[in-house]
Every structure is written in structure tokens, then in C-alpha cells.
Amino acid sequence: MEQQIHITLQFDLAIGKVNLNEIVYRLEQLKNPLMLEILKTILTGYDDLMADRLSPQSGVMTPSKMRKGLGRHVRKGDPNNRFCHGRCIRKRGYRQHLRVLSTVFGKLQLPLRVAECRVCGARHSPLLDALNITPYSRKESNFEHEVIEAVIDTNYRRLVEGRSIDISLGGIHNLVVGSDVDQMAPAASVDLGDLAAIMADGTGYKRQKGEKGELRSVIGITTGGKVEPLGTFANTQWSDIEQIVKERFKQTKAAGIPFIYDGEPGLDDFLADVTESQRCTWHGPRGLYHSMWEDGLRKNQSQPHIDQLKHLIGIELPKGDYELLKDQDKAAVEDKYRSSKAEIAELIDVFKEHGYQKGATYLENLSERIFTNIELWLKTGVIAPKTTSLLERIFREIGRRVKRIAWGWSDATVTKLSKMIILKKYSKEKWEQYWKQKLGINGHFSIHFVHAELRPCHNF
């Protein structure tokens, strides 16, 4: 049903003195009050339309087809809260107090009509049911959307002061707790054939009562270079995470893609039946420093070995189509790969001779998993990631929010917030799809601007 809203705006313009900036400034101030008034006009008009269709006009009822979906209410006195079949009402005025709802435009003060069912006598508000507003709801979901996006994009102080969103820190917590974002990841929804690599890492955060917590995340990198979130978990064992992640795969056969990690305990055999383990080439030398420090070496003593390791694992792969590369280019990479492995083996022997057992053990474990990306390229020509830098950036985004806003929150709530951050920042299509479904955007309402006309004011 099409209707029009006629708006009258009056402005006072100082001829020859006003500038564009002041005009835009005043219009910006008018935006939210104007949107609230338009919203209120639409809703009151909708309420009047429903009341007219549900009540007899000159003793004649509106055809049932025109009343379909309107006036639903629970039958009065029914112990099972079943719906009444009556769709005919008596108008009983309006509720004594206005209904206040938080919206993205501000506080909406809405008068609610009271209707009395002619069949069971129950009193209800047809508008609330038609708009899917629960009896005790005090906000609409676009407000929740605005708050969640603001939390992801900025810190709490700027959220309140910069965006003028009236909500407490506890209110943000309640929105995140009540979110159903954790239901977005259906089982068997990810095809391993679409992934170029999988990464996993963890970061610390402050739990309730000041205890230290561990937030862990697993992501996939698609062949198109996009992030495919595979799961975020708070204080969960890697073995349990592995089982949950596997349930998201359409198949769990070996895919020949690298699993990149920083050497964290518990990840050496993570997803070993579907991926090939690849140690992060940035964390590799860093870990050697710590191992040799445990052997008693200081930085100036271990630095030459660290520099040597960086050189050995820093094999650059030729760019371009693998099939078009010259045989000598491929052979050069393979020669460099074999010589690097041999030199690392020699370095391990040197460490053992000098009694650097921690360093030797570390290098032995590292050498088994540091060249996976090279081996994959030699077999298939696929250039896979070799560092966890992307996941590190994601954790920096998560850390800024979790450590400043979500400190002291429960594990489940921190998990939800981190999932929201990953989706919003790195999987925008899924994020938008989630909110469209949550907000019920189904094409049942549209509004557009028709025209603006300048008329003389009668006060001039």
C-alpha cells in the first residue's frame, strides 16, 4: 500500500552572509530528529490502518483477506497461551504511557493503541505484533547493529562521545551476550578445495577475577586471498578445537595445503590428516633465540646463528605462471632448498658438539616443517603463505577490543565478540548477510524521495 508523507521545513537564511558549511552543519543537526518524526508518522499511520481494518465500519467488517496477518493475540485466560482466532476489535484508546524504543536515530516515543478482541475480550496492541516487537523490548535491532559495529570500529569512550550512542558498557555486554552470531557457522560448509592455507594462533586476555585467559582462532585463506573464519575459541584445548574445525569441512581427506603456525605447543599435529604443517618463517628464527638463551647464550652470541637461519629459510619463489617458468628457474629453487636443508643439518651437528641441546632440538623440529611451502611449490606450483602475519593482524584487531572493552567478560561472550570482529573486518559478505537475516530485510518496505519544492513562507 503506497502512501506519502508531506514534510514542511522552514529555514531562515541571511542573504549575502551564510556559507555552505553552516547550511550543512544545520542540516546534520536536523537529520536524527527528522528521521524520528518520519518513523513515528509511518508507525502511527500503520497503526491507524490496522485499527480501521480490524474494526467494523458502519457495521460492516473488512474482508478477511485484508485482515490477514493482523491483530494476532493470545486468547484471554488460555492456560496454554494459544492464539485467539478472532480478528475483530473494539478501539479502547491509547496506553497511558508512551512506548520508548532506542533506535539508531535516538529515542522514539510511540503512542500505542489499545484494542479489545470482540471474541475473547483480550486487550492488546496490534501494532506491536505486526512489527514483531516483544512486550518488554526497548530497542530495535538496527540499534544493536549500530552499537556492535561501533564497538568493533572504535573504543568505548569514542563510541559514546563520538557517535552519541547512549548505552552503558554493561549494555554492550548484554548485546554481545544475546547475539546469535555463534550460530552462523553451519556444519560441513567449507570446501577444502577452495582454501590455499589454514592458520591458527592464540593470544592472552584478562578473564573474570583477573585470571589469564587464552583466545584461540583458526582461519582459512581462500585461493582468492580472502579470509574464511573457521572458529574462535576462548580457553579451549587445541584437540577440542581441531574436532570442531573438522566438522566445518565438507570432506576431511588430505588436501595438500599448508597449515601455518608459530610453533605453539599442541599445534604440531593439528589437522595433520588434511594439511601439511608449515612453521611460520618469521617466528622460526625468533624461537631459535629463546632456545639458545635457555642454553646459556646471550644475544650477541646467538645472533650469528639466527642470521644464518634467516638466510637459509628465506627462499624466494619465482613469480608468474608455474607452467611457463624455465626449467633452470625451477632447478635453482630446488637446489637452494636442498642446500638449505643440508646446512641446517650441519648447524644442528654444530649445536650438539657445543652442548646446545635446546637449540639443536628446536632446529630439528623446525627443519621438518619450515620448508613445506617450498615442497608444495615444487610439486604443484602453488605459492602458499609462509607466515602467520595475517592472523597476527587479526589478533591485533581482536586484542584492542577484548583487552579494553571485554576484560572480565565470560569466555562465551569473549568468543562471540571475537567472531564478530573477524566477520566484520575480514568476511564482510557474511557479516552483511547475517545482519540482513537478523533484521528481517525481506523487501516488504521501501521508501524513496519524490521531490523538494521551495515555497515562500507566509511570515515573509
Question: What is each of the regions a protein language model found here?
Answer:
Residues 212-215, 291-303:
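Short, surface-exposed amphipathic charged segments that create phosphate/polyanion-binding patches used
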Residues 267, 285-288, 301:
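The catalytic "switch" region of P-loop NTPases
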Residues 2-74, 78-81, 251-278, 303-460:
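Acidic/histidine-rich catalytic cores and adjacent linkers
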